[in-house]
Amino acid sequence: MKQFYIVDSSMLPEVVGKVIAARALLQNGEVKQVSEAVKQVGISRGTYYKYKDYVFLPDPEMASRKAVISLMLHHDRGILSEVLTTMSQAQASIVTINQNIPIHNWASVVMSFDISALQGTLDDLVTKLGNIRGVSDVHLVSVE
């Protein structure tokens, strides 16, 4: 299995950043050929080919964290809206919502959301959601 490291760029040779810059020029369509890209950034083609498959910038999507909660909502007007408002106030960005039809006036809801900018803790959010009128059985299903 391959091992990966997160290393401060100041610890790496300058060519690593130039290889990433050359790849960006090619991917963005600013240049059409490798020879043009390496000339612009100031490295040799050999250096580019040596490192191109091994150095990458972190993916911004990887920095996001997701959580999934399940809860039961009473079938009354405005309860889901209040749940969403509470999530928004905590800076939780909703990714998916799945609500089943109400049975005996209770609907099961499962929500996934991005917590990378969450204000407060997940426990605080779960508690706030559980305190909303018409909301019960709030459970944190998973966090990634």
Curated annotation (Swiss-Prot):
PROSITE patterns: ACT. CDD domains: ACT_PheB-BS. Belongs to the UPF0735 family. InterPro entries: ACT-like_dom_sf, ACT_dom, UPF0735_ACT_dom-cont. Residues 68-143 form the ACT domain. This is UPF0735 ACT domain-containing protein LCABL_12100. Gene3D superfamilies: 3.30.70.260.
